[in-house]
């Protein structure tokens, strides 16, 4: 089982799909990583040679993924909350941040309906 960026990749999936199991890597980025590493997109992760795994690890290390990316996103939200911007206030109150209506919808963000 290939382990890249602290994530065990599924063995029976194509490497392009398996790379998307890493937080911060989507399908397009996975294709770019495979091309840069010189690995065919059709190869299964169980069939990777150790050299190919090392090349993929080196390419993935160039991106901000997993813990570093999660930390950066949470720090960005914390910064918005600390400076008291409109977006920070919306985060603090648990309301939609990007201008969506809240009269009828936004149940996911607001939580379960409170009975009066």
UniProtKB/Swiss-Prot annotation:
GO BP terms, alphabetized: translation
MF terms (GO), sorted A to Z: rRNA binding; structural constituent of ribosome; tRNA binding
InterPro entries to which the protein is assigned, alphabetical: Rbsml_uS13_C, Ribosomal_uS13, Ribosomal_uS13-like_H2TH, Ribosomal_uS13_bac-type, Ribosomal_uS13_CS
PROSITE patterns: RIBOSOMAL_S13_1 (PS00646), RIBOSOMAL_S13_2 (PS50159)
Record keywords, A-Z: Ribonucleoprotein, Ribosomal protein, RNA-binding, rRNA-binding, tRNA-binding
GO CC term, one of those recorded: cytosol
Ribonucleoprotein recorded as keyword: yes
Ranges of compositional bias, category Basic residues: 106-116
Coiled-coil intervals, chain numbering: none
Matching Pfam families: Ribosomal_S13 (PF00416)
Region spans: Disordered: 92-116
Keyword Heme set for record: no
Subunit-structure text: Part of the 30S ribosomal subunit. Forms a loose heterodimer with protein S19. Forms two bridges to the 50S subunit in the 70S ribosome.
PANTHER family (UniProt xref): 30S RIBOSOMAL PROTEIN S13/40S RIBOSOMAL PROTEIN S18, SMALL RIBOSOMAL SUBUNIT PROTEIN US13M
Task performed by this protein: Located at the top of the head of the 30S subunit, it contacts several helices of the 16S rRNA. In the 70S ribosome it contacts the 23S rRNA (bridge B1a) and protein L5 of the 50S subunit (bridge B1b), connecting the 2 subunits; these bridges are implicated in subunit movement. Contacts the tRNAs in the A and P-sites.
Family: Belongs to the universal ribosomal protein uS13 family.
Protein name: Small ribosomal subunit protein uS13
Organism taxonomic ancestry: Bacteria, Bacillati, Bacillota, Bacilli, Lactobacillales
Gene name in the database record: rpsM
